[in-house]
Curated annotation (Swiss-Prot):
<dbReference type="Pfam" id="PF03602">
    <property type="entry name" value="Cons_hypoth95"/>
</dbReference>
<dbReference type="InterPro" id="IPR002052">
    <property type="entry name" value="DNA_methylase_N6_adenine_CS"/>
</dbReference>
<dbReference type="GO" id="GO:0052913">
    <property type="term" value="F:16S rRNA (guanine(966)-N(2))-methyltransferase activity"/>
</dbReference>
<keyword id="KW-0949">S-adenosyl-L-methionine</keyword>
<keyword id="KW-0489">Methyltransferase</keyword>
<protein>
    <recommendedName>
        <fullName>Ribosomal RNA small subunit methyltransferase D</fullName>
        <ecNumber>2.1.1.171</ecNumber>
    </recommendedName>
</protein>
<dbReference type="InterPro" id="IPR004398">
    <property type="entry name" value="RNA_MeTrfase_RsmD"/>
</dbReference>
<comment type="function">
    <text>Specifically methylates the guanine in position 966 of 16S rRNA in the assembled 30S particle.</text>
</comment>
<dbReference type="InterPro" id="IPR029063">
    <property type="entry name" value="SAM-dependent_MTases_sf"/>
</dbReference>
<keyword id="KW-0808">Transferase</keyword>
<comment type="similarity">
    <text>Belongs to the methyltransferase superfamily. RsmD family.</text>
</comment>
<keyword id="KW-0698">rRNA processing</keyword>
<dbReference type="GO" id="GO:0003676">
    <property type="term" value="F:nucleic acid binding"/>
</dbReference>
């Protein structure tokens, strides 16, 4: 008997504002892929001034669908670098970039932790939304600091599970700018201040 493989369910979310407003981004239903909701993305980008975004090179450390990186360039960020390890997620991300003729989103298939061990350049805005119930967030923050991935006054967005006594404690020189929470998710925006 032939065993049929279960196909990944594909849904989509939309770009909220800017150059690619209302464009749909495909989302595959696969392990550890948990795209930031439209509501949370809208809140996040309302926290960041348009002037800041337009001058920024962004890094999305656990890109998944690429929604955060694409939203940033839609709002005229200079560039976004998206790091993702899952092959299917990369396939659909590259497909939407081609469809929308986006050339300033750079997609890298890599293990984020390993990639951050090799310093490359500093970024203005960093998105951190790793899979829940892992130590990835803690490891990523340590590497961002150790290897100077953050420019002075860089903004760091963190999305984590809203679990009592398990929220990450940020570095002393990261100033909390904004935070909100839902029943399951705690999300916050920090500023890196090197001369703190």
């Amino acid at each position: 008997m032939k065993i049929l493989k279960k196909k990944s369910k594909i849904t989509s979310i939309q770009i909220i504002s800017g150059k690619y407003k209302n464009s749909r981004i495909p989302i595959i239903n696969t392990k550890n892929l948990r795209p930031t909701t439209n509501y949370i993305r809208e809140t996040l980008f309302n926290w960041i001034s348009n002037e800041k975004i337009k001058k920024s090179h962004c890094l999305d450390c656990f890109s998944g669908s690429g929604a955060l990186g694409i939203e940033a360039v839609s709002r005229y960020a200079l560039s976004s670098t998206c790091i993702e390890i899952q092959k299917k997620a990369i396939f659909f991300l590259k497909k939407i970039l081609i469809k929308l003729s986006i050339t300033n989103v750079h997609v890298i298939r890599a293990n984020t932790i390993q990639w951050l061990k090799k310093p490359n350049k500093s970024y203005d805005i960093i998105f951190l939304d790793p899979p829940f119930k892992t130590t990835l967030l803690k490891q990523t923050i340590a590497l961002l600091i150790k290897n100077n991935w953050l420019k002075n006054n860089a903004l760091i967005y963190i999305e984590q599970e809203n679990t009592l006594n398990k929220l990450i404690t940020p570095p002393n020189n990261w100033i909390l700018k904004k935070e909100k929470k839902t029943k399951k998710i705690h999300y916050s925006l920090y500023m890196n201040v090197n001369n703190f």
